[in-house]
Amino acid sequence: MHPKEMFPNHSTQQLINRIGAAAISLFAIASVVSAAPKADAPILVEAEGFADTGGWAVDPQFMDLMGSPYLLAHGLGVPVKDANTEINIPKAGSYRVWVRTKDWVAQWKAPGTPGKFQLLINGKPLKTTFGTVGAQWHWQEGGKIQLAKGKLKLTLHDLTGFEGRCDAIVFSNDPTFTPPNKDPEMASWRRQCLGHPKQPENAGEYDLVVTGGGIAGICAAVTASRLGLKVAFIQDRPVLGGNNSSE
């Protein structure tokens, strides 16, 4: 059905509201925490899918490298509020933990590690402090931990307010397993862990595809819709407006 048929008498503001709601819905759908894990399979937790992201911001800057957004502790020097979520551990035992992160100043060989943060398991921090090594995105190992079967609370605790970054968390009870760090192996593995299909679902045919919800994108999508075109509007931010938004 064409937008003109769907909204024959709607004002521009009403169209913007509907487009915004659709874009936000797509953003929410894309933020999946984890699929139901098998007892002996690695458990992948996408940070942007945390039930409560607290003061951490969802940032899609490196989606071309990782295939999904990540959480960013943008606190201007003041530690941000904790991010929290719950996952299910299918089998009790000893698990190794990894966090995909980076030391964002390491590429300039700058002193200090301003993006430091902790991972808390049921309120208890792991001994490893994350975001302290590596100029590139990588899986920083967090050691071994004994986990009981059932619900588990995860908390990301920012230590500095200076751009700590967390992409994902992995738990594995296989002592020989190491998460892949490069594509295409990593992309294939992440799709498998999350239960995503190998090929994207066909969303149909459109007269116009608009990518980006900035002022230009909004105007293009609204104008095309009002002219009767079937428009696909792609937006990876939680709000519309681009550089003119509340972000």
Where are these predicted regions, by residue range?
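N-terminal secretory signal peptides that target proteins for export/translocation
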Residues: 1-17
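Bacterial N-terminal signal peptides
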Residues: 18-31
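N-terminal Rossmann-fold NAD(P) dinucleotide-binding loop
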Residues: 217
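Gly/Ala-rich phosphate-binding loop of Rossmann-like dinucleotide-binding domains
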Residues: 221, 225
